[in-house]
């Protein structure tokens, strides 16, 4: 049985996880390349990959990514995986927003909704966490295995970290709701009358 305070804490944690997921999608900082310039007139070079944007300090612009020229030849599997990450992260946000609506229904509903609502909310949080975790893992795999990230200077950047923290919070929140439902006693329920007293 879960109480309002448990759902309230879960709501705040889910809001934080959703904000981090949205920030990781919006910021073009999944993978970054930084190299300092050499010599008197050397300029530093910075490149950052977002899920839908590629920013480059040499041109000073950001462009849509991946484009057709990014996906020719051996890069096809990279582009396919990168687009999959974009889809999975968008799907995770949709699930997290559905969970926030679920919290509103459970918190504004009665005791029966609080008694049963944890099943739906924790299940959706697990799915959202697993989806974000898969996205994080695909980007880490591409970082380790794709040739474009072979030169020194590449690193996993802040959006990847936000994604990692977000799915961790989602999974831990789901586990907390499940644990509270199992461990906490019934909330304000009727006391049973012993059979011998009637």
Protein language model regions, located:
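Signature of small four-pass
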Residues: 1-32, 81-143, 163-185
